[in-house]
Amino acid sequence: MRKVVEQIRAQQASDGDGVKLLRVFGGARPERFDPFLMLDEFGSDVASDYIGGFPPHPHRGFETVTYMLQGKMEHRDHMGNVGLLNDSDVQWMTAGRGIIHSEMPRQTEGRMRGFQLWVNLPAANKMKPAQYKDIPGDDIPVYTFGNFSVKAIAGQITLGDTLVKGYFDVPDTQAMMLDIHLAPGSVVELPLQSSMTSLVYTYDGAVALGEDKVPARQQTLSRMTGEGALQVTNDSTEEARLLVLAGEPLREPIVQHGPFVMNSVAEIEQAIEDYQAGVLAG
């Protein structure tokens, strides 16, 4: 069984136009999370915490996955795409060589909650054309196994006799993103490839990880060892909900400057120059 090697408490942060959020991971020593770069959780019942949204801004060199649990968020980009994310919808955006987009709330009150995950691209694909796709929540596969369920956003894994296949296939890294809900007393074992990075973010309730049953409470990211199955147990009296992220590390240099993630300082400088010259997105 995989074991917990590190646990990180999500930290309060602010991004965009004053949007309050939790930075789950990102920044220092990014190789720990390879091929993932950053995970944010945003969520509030107070409109002033999210109403400013994320006005137009650039990206280059990676992909973003936005997963809405509750609320309404509108995407617009330089390619003319417009999409509205509602409860349980998912957006997968490939920045590639460059995209300029905004993410703005389309509500003035009520609950907004969700996640944004950054997934790295290999050097060979960092300058590929930008792409964007919105997926209604009802189109994301959900697999029910008695006392737990798996919403398969990306990747695939076999649980028992069932092939759990996510909506998105990510050939560069075999990236997996699963939203798992565990009823009290349930146990799930995920047979991951030994070479894969594996991360567990408990966003509601509490679980225990591995044979040692290391506690993983709400707003905690657990980074696991790279061998054996990933075992998650809900020993509590309430439902637990968590994101499981797994993927093959790229093992390439990671150089990040704000919204740009490349392999060298020179490439970052070029991205900044391209953006300032108005040619980032071609």
Positions of predicted regions on the chain:
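Jelly-roll (double-stranded beta-helix
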Residues: 1-282
